[in-house]
């Protein structure tokens, strides 16, 4: 999947599509087996060192690695899978970002699904970071506006607030 028909896929769009398919599956909708095979084939094409993911080619991006790991978890990789263990270790060592809400969104979901001590530590850091960075005055009160990454800069306060809200509701999804 990508932004137009018949174009090579990218990890970002594949992530959104697989989250939608996961939600559909949880609502008892049938997901064609060929779709799962194709998603795994794409993820194989952008994976490097068995745990890291790039955007359209093998790589090691923070956000794309979090997306790739979450997709693999949704597609059946278990917590004890070597690729999941290695990827989760990488996310845990990297920790939450002060400005990259896209990475935080996917990494938080990965850590939540992984559970355990690494999730507990991640959750405290992420939650406290969001609470402490929330706007406190005037028209910004209750919102977020991080600086530093493409999405936060382009999307502004609305994007950051939306992503922060979805991060904080991770306890109630999937």
Each PLM stretch: what is its role?
Residues 1-37, 44-89, 93-128, 132-174:
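An alpha-helical repeat/solenoid feature that recognizes helix-turn-helix modules
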